[in-house]
A protein has these predicted regions:
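Short, linear, compositionally biased motifs with a strong N-terminal bias
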Residues: 13, 491-493
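N-terminal secretory signal peptides that target proteins for export/translocation
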Residues: 1-6
Length: 494
């Protein structure tokens, strides 16, 4: 392992000195239904304090967030490999194992560690890792996903129950989507630049119940949320590149959608009453649609050899400033109609935070179900948070925005002092506080609605490069930091 790959990172539990087990506390990425909200009380005002440490252990690197079930903490990591350059700011984790850890919540003891098969080693973006998807649990079993293998289920005691190989995937940045549990199904979004899909797997057998192709999208890194309407089937809400959609949890049928958003979606949707909020950052330049030729027009102008596609030299005739690899989705070194149509959509796409009222079917883009949208001040990776009827957005540079979730009106906006950093971790609301952790682990908390003067900050000593979202449970607070070596601390509240 190269020494440059290591840094000291921290996961902390803050709470009572005696840590009780209490069922499923934080069962999936972003907690209950991805909300980022916990019922915890007695949490600290500042995150940088080093007092009251109960235990600390060290773990290998990875970007998955921990989950909590009873007396167990589960998380995944990559162990023993070596990052090698794969070109174009992509890397491959060569030779390492993909592992799942179970940790005793009370004393930090590693209860078990299991390695997954690794039939391939797909490349990923340097800020990602091969162990980014977070586990999910139903208290009795835990389910994990690795892009280099697929899905695996273990009992909470570490016995393997089943495995389902998936892939390979064509996702140049690696994976970021975590599995969720819906009734008796494990649901997973497998978006990529070719053949994207979503599937539901029987949580008891690992058999595929349904699989829904998603040809209208490309790569994304989202974890869904679940919406239960008053009437009708349970719905799985899935943000995507270029649209937000709902699917029947029972059948995988696409029920409704709203077009719009950026071309790389990373945030988890938020359900608040009958409203759904979806953030999609990274627009393509907002070029007018008529400013980019259709495929027919491009071929007529550029296809000099008459084969019906464009090679690298021909592409320069119609897109002299665009690299072939950015348009060629299937990596065959040619631009066909699918490649070009998604290129046009990408170039015209806009970052967007959409607020959608549930209740329709089919295409809701031009209906009053799209209540409001915002195209500025949006996060790249962090998910929105709605806490105490205030919508929080934290983006790179420490720019914090608070909004009225009903109207989209901005209450207040400003930069967090001493936290002008990149933000990958999503904010979490608990105990009348909102916690935000930056890339370099500059901890911040806000108390009370939009009152910025009551923000406090504190660096998490020895913690660097935080990308996982905080985890809260009962009167405890858990924080995981990566992407390199992780350490775990348990603390008592003061």
């Amino acid at each position: 392992m190269q020494a440059s790959r290591y840094a000291f990172c921290v996961l902390a539990l803050l709470g009572v000195a005696s840590i009780p087990a209490s069922g499923t506390d934080w069962p999936r990425f972003r907690g209950p239904n991805g909300s980022g909200i916990a019922d915890a009380t007695g949490l600290p005002a500042d995150l940088g304090d080093q007092r009251n440490i109960l235990w600390k252990i060290f773990l290998p690197w990875g970007h998955s967030s921990p989950i909590i079930s009873g007396n167990h903490i589960f998380l995944t990591a990559a162990e023993g490999g070596e990052e090698t350059d794969a070109g174009r700011e992509k890397v491959v984790d060569a030779g390492g194992q993909l592992v799942t850890f179970a940790i005793d919540r009370g004393n930090g003891e590693i209860l078990w560690k299991k390695a997954a098969p690794r039939p391939r080693m797909e490349r990923y973006e340097k800020t990602n890792s091969p162990a980014s998807p977070s586990p999910v649990t139903d208290d009795e079993n835990v389910y994990v996903f690795f892009g280099d293998f697929g899905l695996i289920s273990y009992t909470v005691e570490g016995d393997e129950r089943w495995r389902l190989p998936l892939g390979p995937f064509n996702n140049v940045n690696g994976h970021g989507s975590s599995p969720i549990l819906v009734d008796d199904k494990v649901i997973l979004v497998c978006d990529s630049d070719t053949a994207p899909y979503m599937l539901a797997v029987d949580k008891n057998t690992g058999k595929v119940i349904w699989k829904t192709d998603r040809p209208e999208t490309t790569r994304s890194y989202v974890t869904p949320a679940v919406f239960q309407p008053k009437d009708g089937p349970l719905e799985v809400i899935v943000p995507s590149a270029y649209f937000l959609a709902s699917y029947s949890a029972d059948t995988g049928e696409k029920l409704w959608w709203v077009n719009g958003g950026g071309w790389q979606t990373k945030s988890t949707p938020i359900i608040h009453g009958d409203m759904i909020y979806s953030n999609s950052w990274e627009g393509g330049g907002q070029i007018p649609a008529d400013g980019i030729p259709t495929f027919t027009e491009a071929i007529k102008k550029a296809d000099k050899n008459g084969d019906g596609v464009m090679n690298e030299q021909e592409l320069k005739i119609v897109e002299p400033k665009r690299k072939l690899y950015l348009i060629d989705l299937d990596h065959d070194k040619l631009v066909d109609q699918r490649d070009w149509e998604f290129h046009r959509i990408r170039r015209t796409s806009k970052s967007s935070l959409m607020a959608v009222r549930h209740g329709g079917r089919g295409n809701l883009t031009e209906t009053d179900h799209l209540v409001w949208s915002l195209e500025k001040f949006l996060p790249n990776v962090p998910s929105p948070l709605i806490y105490d009827n205030v919508l929080y957005l934290i983006k790179d540079g420490g720019i914090l925005s608070t909004l009225d979730p009903q109207t989209g009106e901005i209450f207040k906006q400003g930069r967090l002092r001493k936290a002008l950093d990149k933000y990958y971790a999503s904010p979490v609301g608990a105990d009348d506080k909102v916690y935000m952790i930056s890339h370099r682990a500059q901890g911040r908390r806000s108390v009370g609605d939009t009152d910025f003067p009551r923000l406090r900050g504190g660096g998490l000593r020895h913690a660097r490069h935080r990308r996982e979202s905080p985890v809260y449970s009962d009167s405890q607070y858990a924080l995981l930091s990566g992407p390199t070596d992780k350490s775990i601390e348990a603390r008592a509240s003061s």
